Amino acid sequence: MIILNKVFHFCAAHRYGNPDLSETDNLAAFGEDLNIHGHNYELTVSITGAVNPATGFLVDLGHLKEVVKEHILKQVDHSQIEIDIPWFKGRQPSTENMVVWMWEQIAS
């Protein structure tokens, strides 16, 4: 068994906030992240398995790149996450929620 990591990069913006909290409570919870701000993200996709003896490959990297591009990068790159991606309506655009969303995109 081996683990193959493929790294992808994208840029996106977001802001935190909870409409159910007061301005004071939002500021206490999220600080300056209440303001729209951006990040340069790095997504690492890890594939675990055995090398195919016929090809010498664990995975078709071209196919992996296409799946990530079509299902994740096209939606998230240069977006404002909580506005442009419907899944985030009513959810914080946190790194943790981004991972959940990305997994759902690839697994579906």
Cite the ranges covered by each PLM segment.
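Charge-rich, low-complexity N-terminal segments
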Residues: M1-S108
